[in-house]
């Protein structure tokens, strides 16, 4: 044509090596004239392979270019702006058509599969085959079985009416009311809400209260079982999306269980964990239903608890059906997190042989009616499956509603993500305790530490346990202890001070004991920090007791190998001072607790003498992941951690003397200097 070769639709000569008409756009010419059939004239535009490839590449990056981007693309490819615009429109339409087609094919296949399944089920029903044994059943018996079940149901309803007429004033009406109020939270506050049941007035409980409690407990148990299911839709896979997803999921959860709307300022935390525990199902249930044993097992979390009322001791010689009212305090080892006071009922039920559920729930619908500092315990507890080999499979669920404003900002992510008092910490604490019991009962302790009698090893373990408990209490100050918080001027904001005056108390130094504690954030993960603090080679870099010299281990008792739980008796080389120490590092966090002990006293303990008279003042470190960026749920291999340093010092031998403010300032300086030395040794930003 015209001696110039063929031109493409836009008047461009194709580049060498490119075929003519690689792709054709068919578009409507809005300015064209109608043809004979009344349609619009259609105009074709041929594009080269080069133009098509460039358009495809741009589409992969941005399928919706702006007007400016379309203009620049047209200039670069010698195409009109409308051509570029139409190409992208056509491309998007084509992609949508392909996707719709693929979805239709998939849905059709799924539809055909469901129809086939339906036909199979219909055929099975017509043949009346037993789903278990596959043998034919007698269809004539079906109607009889239905009538029998209806008769049994009617008998049960009569028994319920008789029970309610005996204990409640309006049987049927009252039964409906309690069943509506039974969920962990019910309808709106003040409307058909369960009354706040008095936990403070005596130990007698009316049958009416018992009936209400039992209904609450049964409903909470059903809710816990639902939340424990593997495919339960209320759990988020990744807690990092909590800020975006928890509201929607919480609304779904609340509507499913008829829960009350959260009051303003209240935060809901929920977590779930699953693992093996080296304890039989029955033993674990008995431990949970005995408040004293429960506190002993979960001492790092529960400093104090009491059974207020026993409403039922169970049936058939077991704990199944046992119902109790319990008051307790939960703690995070930090002065920046106040104790969480909880009041709840605990219900235990055997679902089938070897499968037990223990559930807690606070018996009030409105947490604002609880005493100050208390939180509401939503259905929480354990689903325990006995594995018949000395182990149990435990699914732990923790839910709570509390006021976040009482918690320091450093710890709000830790608590909000269910780390500080979440299911994973409870389960790890249980696993560590059970493994310790298993190790100490099955291992010859004299083989662990040569030269130490079995009785002596037992007493050292007992002494270390008392030391660790005293360390906890020196930071969190449970209500049953004698610690008194003091206000000190011109000290660090995160620092807390308490005093305790001891007068001839067994196992306590006589005089005034000062307890100081502080919590700081460090840009290092839990395991790295624990390894540094617990390793004897680095001890002189931060511990003032060593006086810049080394320490050696004279006794070592490994309580729980998998959790790094070790009790040691350390000796400072240059002065012979002995230091008792216990450490662990697991999913619940890490702990290093130590205390200087008098040489003569510890020698008696090593020979098997009672350790109750040994006096000491513990110090130590508590380490937990900071809860930011999901570091806790990825094993805390990255991110930061929260370090709590607690120190107890005898500041006066006269219990009646006044505390000197200068002493407090010296202790503050000592603690600050210790933390600075840790940061410096780890090359952390200060």
Curated annotation (Swiss-Prot):
Residues 1-24, 173-202 are annotated as: Disordered. It is found in: Nucleus. GO terms for cellular component: nucleus. Residues 38-98 bind DNA. Belongs to the HD-ZIP homeobox family. Class IV subfamily. Probable transcription factor involved in the regulation of time of flowering through the photoperiod flowering pathway. May repress FT. This is Homeobox-leucine zipper protein HDG6. It comes from Arabidopsis thaliana. The gene is HDG6.
